[in-house]
Amino acid sequence: MFIGIKSCEKYNDNYAVEVEYIDLFSTRIYPDGKGGQLGDRGHINNIKILEVKEDKVIIADELKKGEYEYSLDTERRNDIAVQHTAEHLFSGIALKDYNLNNVGFRMGEEVSTIDLDSDTISDEMVKELSGKVNEAIRCV
């Protein structure tokens, strides 16, 4: 896949690039924080993508204006998609079976958390809810 670099500016200890997609079929680089999800990582011209914002991509080294090959970490992207889907499944079962609303979700690199609107969730309830979610996943 190829991407156009429209500009490159120093950004803290790294560089911020404004990108332009060359064709309609190029995979878009997904930004951090959109919909509560983690953003894409990968490489542009073998330079590591460190962070993705709505209007710029933060990379580890400087690039001149032009067209470059890029790749995304598909394993990371798939993991993010699975976590996002699991959050919806967990939230749906929590609401349906326990009348608990999801009031917050934070997806992390190592750990993700869901906040439910109750101060009295027991360890047994968490175990039971997790079991129902895992059973629903196995049925799919």
Residue ranges of each PLM-predicted region?
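A glycine- and charged-residue-rich anion-binding loop/surface
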Residues: M1-V140
